[in-house]
Amino acid sequence: MAKAANIIKVEQIGSAIRRHHSQRATLVGLKLNKIGRVTELQDTPEVRGMIAKVQHLVRVVDEK
């Protein structure tokens, strides 16, 4: 039986306006597009790297 994946909730706290296109693309990859939106993602090294890239625009709300 497969092990359940860890889930991480990420909230966008900063605007993508006047940000580099790669940071905007990272927000899209995290399924975020407006301030205050929260998404649930699998806790993987790739997602952690994306969060680190836009750490000034997002906040980790909950880790399960």
From Swiss-Prot:
Keywords: Ribonucleoprotein, Ribosomal protein. GO terms for cellular component: cytosolic large ribosomal subunit. One of its GO terms (biological process) is translation. Belongs to the universal ribosomal protein uL30 family. This is Large ribosomal subunit protein uL30. The gene is rpmD. PANTHER family: LARGE RIBOSOMAL SUBUNIT PROTEIN UL30M, MITOCHONDRIAL RIBOSOMAL PROTEIN L30. Part of the 50S ribosomal subunit.
